[in-house]
Amino acid sequence: MTTSVKPKRKSLGTLAFSQAVNGYQLFNSSRELDIRSKVMLHANGDWGDLAPEDAETNNQVVRRSNGGRLHSVYKLQDNKTIWIISSGYGLTKDDMDLTQFSEQDYCNTVILFPEEY
């Protein structure tokens, strides 16, 4: 597990589960809790099974909080791998000039299986 800086947490924005992840956890509270625990790790700066250089890139994004991308990789209890990707980390709609960007351009987080990328 790759650890990171302990930043002041920012919002992960809107959470979206891919169709496959949503189906995987549907009607299975153990799987749902496992995935949600990984989202909390991601939110707290634990990047999971990332290479050290990728973890450092995430740490730099957290320190700057200016709209970068965070990527985490985790193994679930049944050994399936999920990715959690936050785009626009640290941005809020108040930071955006909505004449140039839409609200979808500020922070959002997607939980997906690698094969869905």
Question: Which residues make up each language-model segment?
Answer:
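Low-complexity, charged, repeat-rich alpha-helical/coil interaction segments
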Residues: 1-3, 92-93
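Short, compact, well-ordered microdomains
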Residues: 66-117
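Compact soluble domain cores
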Residues: 2-71
